[in-house]
């Protein structure tokens, strides 16, 4: 390990332990029946099959033994969560989870590959730096407007689960990076198998939706469908959308909707759920109020509001400025919604959320953190 890597790791360990010393974690239901997993800062190991009788014991572990870059618990409940073999854990049931990433939306998937040793930046994702064959730093260019789109769909998932499927106790979490997790904490759905969970995800997302099965098409030359004022499920979803967006007159007893407009509506109502996550009954999920080691931001519960405006500062546990020494030359690098200029080897004062992010990525070296303050969580 180089001296700069050592100093950066010491800094990250210090701020993470200070943060967790304030006991911010949201305790999941029946923590003693959950598998706990940690991506350890000290040895960069991914440690699974941990179990703790209480959150107090978990705090003792992460404050004294292994500092978590990432901290997870299983969506599943087990009789013996610490057993290494999944088939011997004694599965009791699982929460229902949905995962949304903002890079799945049009115009939101731009990535830079930063080659530190080459002092070069490449558009797109590359596996190795061409000149040195070293591993590049992958830097997604995610804007707030993209995260806002993902939140909008997370809220839509919540409403569908409640209004169409009758489920309750649904929570929306910002992942701490670029997306959202929607969790259903309800014993009624614990025993759902993977195929049943996939069916729910497909119903919500409209993945591979066959219009003809639910909307009989009328006409030969000018094709259309009929929607009445008394609809349920997906048909009501379409009805509400076309009325809300003034696509049709909502005062009529029934709506004659051209097939082309129906197809456009279905496309707009499609939600890019990661169905693999929903199907996985042993999926790991980030602790509420834990730090996401990719960004330095908090995985945080969000109040479900139609008028919610995403603000990255609401998820940053640090305040103040940090002095860093950049390891690369770059002008106008987008970090969150800000653009910064970096000159290799020239000290620069950065806002803490930018500095922590760049430190986690290995793009800068920490020089002084005297002005850094941990916010009240």
Swiss-Prot record:
Any one GO biological process: DNA replication, synthesis of primer
Class of enzymatic activity (EC top level): transferase
Keyword flag Cytoplasm: no
Cofactor section: Mg(2+); Mn(2+)
Coiled-coil parts of chain: none
Domain of life from the UniProt record: Archaea
Gene3D superfamilies, alphabetized: DNA primase, PRIM domain
Any Pfam family the entry gives: PriS_C
InterPro entries named in the record: DNA_primase_S, DNA_primase_ssu_euk/arc, DNA_primase_ssu_PriS
Assigned keywords, A-Z: DNA replication, DNA-directed RNA polymerase, Magnesium, Manganese, Metal-binding, Nucleotidyltransferase, Primosome, Transcription, Transferase
Enzyme Commission identifier(s): 2.7.7.-
GO CC terms in record: DNA-directed RNA polymerase complex; primosome complex
UniProt key word Acyltransferase: no
Active site, renumbered: 99, 101, 274
Molecular functions per Gene Ontology: DNA-directed RNA polymerase activity; metal ion binding
Intrachain disulfide bonds: none
Record family assignment: Belongs to the eukaryotic-type primase small subunit family.
Subunit annotation: Heterodimer of a small subunit (PriS) and a large subunit (PriL).
Function: Catalytic subunit of DNA primase, an RNA polymerase that catalyzes the synthesis of short RNA molecules used as primers for DNA polymerase during DNA replication. The small subunit contains the primase catalytic core and has DNA synthesis activity on its own. Binding to the large subunit stabilizes and modulates the activity, increasing the rate of DNA synthesis while decreasing the length of the DNA fragments, and conferring RNA synthesis capability. The DNA polymerase activity may enable DNA primase to also catalyze primer extension after primer synthesis. May also play a role in DNA repair.
Protein name according to UniProt: DNA primase small subunit PriS
Source organism per UniProt: Staphylothermus marinus (strain ATCC 43588 / DSM 3639 / JCM 9404 / F1)
Gene name linked to the record: priS
